[in-house]
Amino acid sequence: MTVLVRLLAAAAFALIAVTPLRAQDFSTAQRGEIEKIIRDYIIAHPEVLQEAMSELEKRQQAAELEKARTAVKSHSDAIFNSPRQVTLGNPQGDVTFVEFFDYNCGYCKRALSDMMELMKKDPKVKVVLKEFPVLGASSVEAAQVAVAVRMQDPKKYLDFHQKLLMGRGQADKARAMAVAKEVGLDTARIERDLKSEEVAKTLEESMKLAEALGLNGTPSYVIGNDVVIGAVGFAALNQKVQAARK
């Protein structure tokens, strides 16, 4: 903490951290003088505001991540072992890598290669995919079809996932159904399954988990007990996986 910040903290303490009785000991003139000192410091050194805001943001982010880690422990079974989830990689892996994604998320498209590289280079990692359609009705439609694909043939899910995520244009029901047909799935059965309780409950489960974890964007990851927000790249994700093994 800089000398300037310590001075401002001391001045603020004199104003707000004293007991009610002592606060009354300051006259109006004295309180005005203290406020003037603080104001003069801020005007003379406006960078302290940026420093304070940066520190506040760091503390808020740290608090949010700690809250998310606590939520991971509270919901670990649903996060890592739900019967409704898509599991790739090593199903008996020593570290579970969970991704919340949206088929219309540009950053998710970029992050797909990170997940694929991780599975290729680390045969001991278990990968779990959870549909998290936050970008509108089209995303919900695509996610619903994806769940129906998993229900019909989990082995074809990854091929479907890659083709739909990396395709051009908006991912919606029509495009998702076209991709499902392309990978050899029964689209008539998918149409029936879209009305099933299983599809609705799968997406509901993912949305509730994301809410509990404080996630509001994609891609978001849970790796071990840690939460990672955003397309941070293969190196950062791999580092988290290795840390989870320790």
What feature does the model see in each segment?
Residues 1-4, 97:
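N-terminal secretory signal peptides that target proteins for export/translocation
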Residues 4-8, 24-39, 178-246:
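C-terminal cap of thioredoxin/glutaredoxin-like
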Residues 98, 109-181, 186, 211-216, ...:
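Structural alpha/beta surface segment adjacent to cysteine/selenocysteine redox centers
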Residues 8-17:
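Bacterial N-terminal signal peptides
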